[in-house]
């Protein structure tokens, strides 16, 4: 049986209860930041995926035996080349999506992502990861306009609020 991806049902309560192929995914990511020494300007690292069309925070799936914060720090280093330290947990977001990558029958995925505020301590911003099309430093205001997903916008807003108090 092949399901055409353009005919997938909208995800709603009924879909979540009746779709047979579902899975849970736990990921973690970070709001990696730096403050420019001369001007004091705050900048956040974002990545672009899907041909540069989707701007988002660096994140990825937790590996076996890894804590959520360890995942966030590892993913930021892998995806944007930065060494960071955790300053604090920000929040978790969750959402549902259709995983159609290399699948004859799509899976309905419930994803939970833990986000941390990560201060840059080394490394250099780069887009060497095969998963990333572009990277960049952006002010919180710029990042809020560029981010594709509302959940990540709420994370950046929270990080901006925390950092404005420092």
Please tell me what each predicted stretch does.
Residues 81-123:
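Active-site segment of metal-dependent pyrophosphate-handling enzymes
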């Amino acid at each position: 049986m092949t399901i055409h991806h353009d005919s997938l049902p909208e995800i709603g309560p009924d879909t979540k209860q009746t779709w047979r192929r579902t899975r849970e995914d736990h990921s973690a990511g970070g709001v990696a930041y730096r403050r420019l020494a001369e001007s004091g300007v705050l900048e956040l690292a974002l990545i672009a995926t899907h041909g540069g069309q989707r701007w988002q925070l660096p994140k990825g799936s937790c590996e076996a035996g890894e804590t959520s914060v360890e995942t966030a720090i590892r993913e930021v280093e892998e995806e944007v080349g930065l060494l960071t330290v955790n300053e604090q947990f920000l929040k978790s977001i969750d959402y549902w999506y259709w995983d159609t990558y290399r699948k004859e029958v799509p899976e309905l995925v419930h994803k939970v992502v833990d986000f941390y505020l990560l201060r840059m301590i080394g490394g250099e911003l780069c887009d060497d990861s095969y998963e990333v099309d572009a990277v960049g430093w952006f002010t919180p205001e710029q990042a809020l306009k560029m981010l594709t997903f509302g959940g990540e916008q709420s994370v950046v807003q929270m990080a901006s609020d925390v950092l404005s108090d420092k």
